[in-house]
Structures are given as C-alpha cells and as structure tokens.
Amino acid sequence: MARIAGVDLPKKKRIEYGLTYIYGIGLHTSRKILDKTGISYDKRVHELSEDEAAAIRKEIQENYMVEGDLRKQVAMDIKALMDLGSFRGLRHRKGLPVRGQKTKTNARTRKGKRKTVGAKS
C-alpha cells in the first residue's frame, strides 16, 4: 500500500483514482500530477515502484497544498470572513447557508435538526 501525503492509497485502484483519496486532489489534479511525473493513468497503486511513488510525493509536496495544511487554510479563510463581519462571515457564524440558498424550507444540513418554537395559546 502506497502512502502519499500521509494517506494510505487503496492498492487495487488505478493510480489516477487512488490519488483522489488525498484531501485537496481531485481527478483533474491527479491527472496533471501523473502527466508531470510521466506515470500512466492505467497503472494500479500496488504496481507503483518506489521511485514512482517518490516522484509523486515530491510533485505534491512542492506544488500542491493538501490534507492538514489545506484544511487549516480553509478554516483560516472562513475565520477571516467572520472577523471582517462580511455577509458571508455572518452566515457562517449563524450556521446558515452562505451562497444565497433559501432558508424558509430546506437548508437542514446547515441549520441542523428542527427546533420547535412554542405553540400559540
């Protein structure tokens, strides 16, 4: 099992899909990395030589922000929005949808479980 950027890649998958298990690398980025390192998309993760794995590690480390660093950067960006007091920051702070979705119905993912407001008497 190849370990790249602190993530164990699944052995049986093709390397182009295996790299997408790393946070911050999608299929497009995966293919760009493989093109730069000269590795075939069809190769399986368990077929990688140590030199090829090292080349992929080097390419990712030098040119891409992945895993913990990327998560930290995203969290800092959201915190900066909240500190600025921007509209998007306020929506993040209140736990509401940020990108203009309606909230009268739906938005349950952001709002959480329904909370009943007292009945009229």
UniProtKB/Swiss-Prot annotation:
PROSITE patterns recorded for this chain?
Answer: RIBOSOMAL_S13_1 (PS00646), RIBOSOMAL_S13_2 (PS50159)
Q: Which InterPro entries match?
A: Rbsml_uS13_C, Ribosomal_uS13, Ribosomal_uS13-like_H2TH, Ribosomal_uS13_bac-type, Ribosomal_uS13_CS
Which Pfam families does the entry link to? Ribosomal_S13
GO biological processes: translation
Q: Which UniProt keywords apply?
A: Ribonucleoprotein, Ribosomal protein, RNA-binding, rRNA-binding, tRNA-binding
A GO term for molecular function: rRNA binding
What does the function comment of this entry state? Located at the top of the head of the 30S subunit, it contacts several helices of the 16S rRNA. In the 70S ribosome it contacts the 23S rRNA (bridge B1a) and protein L5 of the 50S subunit (bridge B1b), connecting the 2 subunits; these bridges are implicated in subunit movement. Contacts the tRNAs in the A and P-sites.
What is the name of this protein? Small ribosomal subunit protein uS13
- Organism source for this protein? Campylobacter lari (strain RM2100 / D67 / ATCC BAA-1060)
As recorded in Swiss-Prot or TrEMBL, the protein's gene is named rpsM
